[in-house]
Amino acid sequence: MLYEFLKNFPQRMKNVGLYAVLIQNSMQKTSWKQFGFAKFDEQMNLIFAVMLYIMEQSLKEENCTMDDIGAYIDTINSRYLHKEISYEDSRKLGDFIVNVILSNEGRAMYFDGYDFDQNDYHIMHISYVANRIVYLDQEVRRTSYYLTDDGYNLILSTLEIENNMKLTIHEMIFQMHLEKQSYDKAVDEIKNVFNLMRIQIGRAHV
């Protein structure tokens, strides 16, 4: 390979694709305006708030039906967002987010990442949520939603992975500077490692 830093490029682009496909799906939809979410920032905030709720329900091993999602949106709207929408609108909004934006109305989603080893694009499948049939009170049949591995990777990359990997990332950068013989930058990076260690030790003693 001509450039070693382009190794495993499709894997990098898969992570980029998780954001790109989601943004593309959302920006192309005009239905947001009927719910009062005209700004792109508002739309993305609500999408991720809904994904976090689905993740929370999954982690607690509790059902996550469209009624649950609608009630959740209605609650955060009443308390925080203050859009002029009813509970029924909140439920429709939840259905729109989960089944249209996150699920692409049942159509498969893909993102292409170029493989510089094979001189060709890799077509990578992307899926944020999945569902299963559950029975409430052993009789009522409902669809319950949960995050896929891609969904977890996307959500966790927004905060949890960064928080837990800060020290490791700085160690990786330090190693990369050494490999490139950028010794001055390596010294700066090891200082960052020590600073993070001091912060973590300080928190442990609080």
What residue ranges belong to the model's regions?
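A structured, charge-rich N-terminal accessory region that forms the first stable segment of a protein
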Residues: 12-46, 52, 71
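DNA-recognition alpha helix
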Residues: 65-82
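Charged low-complexity interaction tracts in eukaryotic proteins
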Residues: 3-31, 92-160
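Short, glycine/acidic-rich hinge or "gate" loops at secondary-structure transitions
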Residues: 66, 84-91
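Positively charged, polyanion-binding regions of nucleic-acid-associated proteins
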Residues: 41-66, 95, 174, 178-203
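Eukaryotic basic, amphipathic alpha-helical target segments in cytosolic regions
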Residues: 58, 77-80, 105
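Extended alpha-helical scaffolds
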Residues: 129-205
